[in-house]
A protein has these predicted regions:
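Hydrophobic faces of well-ordered beta-strands that scaffold small-molecule active sites
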Residues: 5-12, 38-42, 69-73, 109-111, ...
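C-terminal helical cap(s) of enzyme catalytic domains, especially alpha/beta-barrels
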Residues: 271-288
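Acidic (Asp/Glu)-rich catalytic clusters
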Residues: 1-2, 27-36, 50-70, 96-105, ...
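Active-site beta-loop-alpha junctions enriched in small/polar residues
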Residues: 10-14, 43-47, 74-78, 114-116, ...
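Active-site acidic/histidine proton-transfer and metal-coordination neighborhood
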Residues: 63-64, 80-180
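Acidic/histidine-rich catalytic cores of soluble enzymes
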Residues: 134-232, 236
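Distinct, well-ordered alpha-helical segments
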Residues: 18-29, 51-59, 120-140, 156-174, ...
Length: 291
């Protein structure tokens, strides 16, 4: 592996603000000092308002703290939209996100691929495939070829994003990576990740589809999650032990299989603290022997 597994939060924890901090430029040194975290995901989920100048300042602060930056593109991207104008707007959200991510020095852009919207899933996937390749081509032409689109598994069966759908799209281009959101996988299948064997089956499928070297580079999200009959309801925190999945089951597998991508915690409000718990679980797995 070219690097070890990087671990960090999606956005700033409530604790960050409670301790008097306001600017994300302060977050990287803060999380390094308190928790030893070396990754951070910038949330553009509800829209892009950041300037390139601000992105540059964020990137400088992250580099000074040796924290890897990733970003999450807007949630409302739908590359499967049958309306060409709306699909083109979604593509622009991705290229705009990539422009800011590049200014921050990051390379991993998490993407929700979209929803069928009255089409068959097969038709929607075909549209997604075509438009993902168009976005990739645009990034290369804009000298942003280092940006890797990380296609996310989703928590509701009504949208595109089953593991098999994501893997089929990732195989389209060598720069694409899966974003394995284990909470979403758990929720979309009615609580499917209950044992270490369940997690192993997910990783086995990824490795079979992409090969072990590329699977090891996967971008990953983790939290506990509340779900219902239609899938995901809301992300939960690690102390909400009545909800799964349990990271202690996954940690030994990531260590024994040599995963070295990025692992982001999406707990609600305690993402830095829970990311630190994940980092500690990985350290215990390394120290205590591999399962």
């Amino acid at each position: 592996m070219s690097r070890g597994l990087r671990v960090g939060p999606a956005g700033n924890s409530e604790l960050f603000y409670e301790q008097g901090h306001k600017s994300t430029t302060d977050a990287f040194a803060w999380q390094r000092r308190l928790f030893g975290l070396d990754a951070f995901e910038i949330p553009f989920g509800r829209g892009i308002s950041m300037t390139v100048e601000t992105a540059g300042r964020i990137g400088l602060a992250a580099r000074e703290a040796d924290v890897d930056i990733s970003a999450h593109a807007p949630y409302y991207v739908n590359l499967a939209n049958p309306d060409e104008a709306l699909a083109a707007a979604s593509a622009r959200y991705l290229t705009d996100s990539a422009r800011l991510l590049q200014a921050m020095g990051g390379t991993r852009l998490v993407v929700h691929v979209g929803s069928p919207k009255g089409q068959t899933r097969e038709e929607a996937l075909e549209r997604c495939a075509e438009r993902l390749l168009m976005v990739r081509s645009a990034l290369v032409k804009e000298d942003r070829g280092e940006i890797r689109l990380c296609l996310e598994t989703m928590g509701r069966p009504s949208v595109l994003g089953t593991l098999e759908e994501i893997l089929s799209l990732v195989r389209l281009d060598g720069s694409f990576l899966p974003c394995l959101d284990f909470a979403h996988l758990h929720a979309a299948q009615g609580g499917s990740l209950r044992s270490q064997g369940d997690f192993a089956q997910v990783l086995d499928r990824v490795e079979a589809a992409l090969g072990l070297p590329r699977a090891r580079e996967s971008h990953m999200h983790f939290s506990r999650i509340e779900f219902g009959a239609k899938g995901e309801i809301r992300h939960r925190v690690f102390s909400d032990t009545g909800f799964g999945p349990d990271f202690a089951l996954l940690a030994p597998l990531l260590v024994s299989r040599g995963y070295g991508g990025t692992l982001i915690c999406e707990s609600r409000g305690t993402m830095a603290q829970d990311a630190a718990e994940m980092k500690q679980a990985l350290a215990r797995a390394r120290a205590g022997g591999l399962t």
